[in-house]
Regions:
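Lipid interaction determinants
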Residues: 1-114
Length: 114
């Protein structure tokens, strides 16, 4: 799981959605137990702990720039950070990483960056 990842989809209250075109969501899980990344408009950081497939993320802190465009970027950012913090389990298959919430739902899917 350690390393840089690009987000491909996020679970929101109304279902799973792909990342909005023209935006980039990322997460880099460091060997020091810190996660950093881009939530589209802002950057974030915080602790994470991984024990086997069990995972806890957060609390996350982020910069607070306003998202002016594209449409929906602000909501996407809030949804991504909430989904990331909701993760309790991870599953990695090759270059794909899936984070699941406590209900067993896919919260975030990511592809290895690069």
């Amino acid at each position: 799981m350690a390393g840089a990842w690009d987000v491909t989809s996020v679970l929101y209250d109304d279902g799973i959605r792909s990342v909005i075109a023209g935006t980039t969501l990322t997460a880099t899980f460091g060997p020091d137990g810190r996660v950093t990344g881009s939530s589209g408009c802002n950057t974030f950081r915080g602790p994470y702990e991984e024990q086997g497939e069990e995972l806890s993320v957060g609390p996350l802190a982020s910069t607070r720039k306003a998202c002016k465009s594209p449409d929906g970027a602000q909501a996407q950012e809030r949804g991504y950070l909430a989904a990331l913090e909701s993760a309790v389990r991870s599953e990695q298959t090759g270059s794909r990483l899936t984070l699941f919430n406590a209900k067993g739902q896919m919260a975030v899917t990511l592809q290895r960056a690069g």
